[in-house]
């Protein structure tokens, strides 16, 4: 009986959805796993006068404000 109970507990633990975490790009090739409360990936581009724009990427709890901003909510959507 104890073996059956232990087996059922193990199967239950393995089948539980322990939570979904979003994955976003932090740099062009580097990714980061977001915190559970961070449900948005963003990409923010700051144009430069000399031609090299600066791009920031990451996770957020809300869509930050800014020019040339992209917000999305699926894995690796902010490339």
UniProtKB/Swiss-Prot annotation:
Keyword set includes Ribosomal protein: no
Tissue distribution: Expressed by the venom gland.
Domain of life according to the entry: Eukaryota
Source taxonomy: Eukaryota, Metazoa, Chordata, Craniata, Vertebrata
Keywords, alphabetical: Acetylcholine receptor inhibiting toxin, Disulfide bond, Ion channel impairing toxin, Neurotoxin, Postsynaptic neurotoxin, Secreted, Signal, Toxin
InterPro entries linked: Snake_3FTx, Snake_toxin-like_sf, Toxin_cobra-type
Record flagged with keyword DNA damage: no
Annotated disulfide bonds: 24-41, 34-59, 63-71, 72-77
N-terminal signal peptide: 1-21
GO MF terms, alphabetically ordered: acetylcholine receptor inhibitor activity; ion channel regulator activity; toxin activity
GO cellular component assignments: extracellular region
Subcellular location: Secreted
Family: Belongs to the three-finger toxin family. Short-chain subfamily. Type III alpha-neurotoxin sub-subfamily.
Organism, as annotated: Pseudonaja textilis (Eastern brown snake)
Cross-referenced CDD domains: TFP_snake_toxin (cd00206)
Function: Binds with high affinity to muscle nicotinic acetylcholine receptor (nAChR) and hinders acetylcholine binding to the receptor, thereby impairing neuromuscular transmission. Competes with the binding of alpha-bungarotoxin on muscle AChR (from Torpedo) (IC(50)=0.30 uM). In vivo, causes muscle paralysis, spasms and increased respiration.
Protein name: Short neurotoxin 7
């Amino acid at each position: 009986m104890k073996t059956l109970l232990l087996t059922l507990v193990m199967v239950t633990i393995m089948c539980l959805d322990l939570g979904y975490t979003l994955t976003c790009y932090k740099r062009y090739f580097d990714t980061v796993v977001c915190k559970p409360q961070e449900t948005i990936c963003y990409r923010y581009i700051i144009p430069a006068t000399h031609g090299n724009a600066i791009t920031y990427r990451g996770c957020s709890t809300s869509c930050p404000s800014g020019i040339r901003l992209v917000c999305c909510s699926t894995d690796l959507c902010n490339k």
